[in-house]
From Swiss-Prot:
It comes from the Bacteria. GO terms for molecular function: DNA-binding transcription factor activity; sequence-specific DNA binding. The gene is mxiE. This is Transcriptional regulator MxiE. Keywords: DNA-binding, Plasmid, Transcription, Transcription regulation, Transport, Virulence.
Amino acid sequence: MEGFFFVRNQNIKFSDNVNYHYRFNINSCAKFLAFWDYFSGALVEHSHAEKCIHFYHENDLRDSCNTESMLDKLMLRFIFSSDQNVSNALAMIRMTESYHLVLYLLRTIEKEKEVRIKSLTEHYGVSEAYFRSLCRKALGAKVKEQLNTWRLVNGLLDVFLHNQTITSAAMNNGYASTSHFSNEIKTRLGFSARELSNITFLVKKINEKI
């Protein structure tokens, strides 16, 4: 299979022939790359890249028709590619405002337990309405909804990976109370904090036997 990747007019295209054509918004790629760089510790200075870049790709990615899954596969292959054209393309994505905005949000929620939109806006230096618009473009969702999701995920990771209690995880992630965290779990995931604790206990026991 022969494919090509290029960036132009805020979109990324990947195609192999006239029968297959995938189109991704560059902001989705920027979000993926920002997460990868942030959590892998790969944040570096990137040089200027051309606005239109292309390269040939030999691997067949047609095994999935899910656009989000396809984007993940492409980005991972691009990140680990040694092709200079690929590196230039990623450098261009790293120059976008969406990329830096996602990094800004990730850094802020790591430093502060409770993040307010007003505070984010003031530090970013734009109006609240414009900030919300930028976030919507970069995140693909409302900024408050996305921040709440990230906070919930961080809380769950504290419980599962760091063996914290529900109470400790709630306090460490800016929840007003344990019940607030518990209600969020129930609303978003469909099971209670007590059930979550039981799941954690069960997983630990299974791992001990293994």
